[in-house]
């Protein structure tokens, strides 16, 4: 069988309009990540994201969480068998504010950093955030490193907890996930915190009455 001339085939297909339309190149983001996600003081910036995992019986659980970008504490989280939606995000927002401020609201806006998921961009989500004293901020499109603290947390939770905890079904997995979040906050060391856990770092800061910068030097 004679060899097929690919260039000739291409030329004939082009002449007869048989080629697929070329996908336009995606322009580079005008909001390229150039700064740091971490901040020097607690309650300046929180970040939020979501992830999912599968139980042994095939159930899929979807988790939404919020972290402080300074002390790394997991402020609040929610798990569901449904999709990522605005209602769940609002529950996490409210839980995070209650965790840090009780019945009060922040005295100055706390930046709420997320990706561009529809549950975060929804008008009702953004309006609710501002009611709670949060200022919604979205990362640059196609720039996951812009929410690197949340991305790193997902890897840690999946690697150090979810991969080894019993998860025969959704109910059992949710209970064990609650213990995982508690263990992370109390015991998981962070290099950025001088190899202390989030709550160990917070307790030491409160005990010494020092700023976050000074705590990092201890």
Swiss-Prot record:
Please list the residue ranges annotated as the Integrase catalytic domain: 23-206
One GO molecular-function annotation for this sequence?
Answer: DNA binding
Tell me if Endoplasmic reticulum is a UniProt keyword of this record: no
Task: Tell me the keywords, alphabetical order.
Answer: DNA recombination, DNA-binding, Transposable element, Transposition
Q: Which domain of life is it from?
A: Bacteria
State the signal peptide span: none
The protein's matches in InterPro entries, at most eight in alphabetical order, are given as: Integrase_cat-core (IPR001584), RNaseH-like_sf (IPR012337), RNaseH_sf (IPR036397), Transpos_IS3 (IPR048020)
One GO biological-process annotation of the entry reads:
transposition
Q: Which cysteines are joined by disulfide bonds?
A: none
Q: What does this protein do?
A: Involved in the transposition of the insertion sequence IS2.
Q: Which PANTHER family match?
A: TRANSPOSASE INSC FOR INSERTION ELEMENT IS2A-RELATED
Q: Which NCBIfam families match?
A: transpos_IS3
**Name under which the protein is recorded:** Putative transposase InsD for insertion element IS2E
